Regions:
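Hydrophobic residues in alpha-helical membrane-spanning segments
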Residues: 22-25, 60
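Short, charged, surface-exposed hinge/linker loops at domain edges
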Residues: 1-4, 38-74
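Extended aliphatic helical segments
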Residues: 18-20, 27, 71-74
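A short, exposed loop/beta-hairpin motif centered on an aromatic-Gly-Thr core
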Residues: 24-33
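Short, flexible helix/strand-to-coil boundary loops that buttress conserved ligand/catalytic motifs
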Residues: 20, 30, 48
Length: 74
């Protein structure tokens, strides 16, 4: 079983965009947080399925670190 970190971003027009940093281009959307997470799981599964079909390596979150930077408002 694989685990991936996801980032949810609330959109001004409503809903949530989900990004999977370890899987480039794996982005999805949901109207609610719950739906966004559900859609992320589906997107990750389809992404990995496509990688397997093409014989490509499956990236993991191993060695991935998260850090929040605060910068001045210039």
């Amino acid at each position: 079983m694989l685990s991936y970190r996801i980032i949810l971003r609330k959109e001004p027009e409503g809903g949530f965009t989900v990004i999977v940093p370890s899987l480039p281009g794996c982005v999805t959307y949901g109207d609610t947080i719950e739906k966004a997470i559900e859609m992320a799981k589906e997107a990750i599964e389809l992404y990995i399925e496509s990688l397997k079909e093409h014989g490509e390596e499956i990236p993991t979150d191993d060695g991935t670190f998260e850090y929040t930077l605060t910068v001045s408002n210039v």
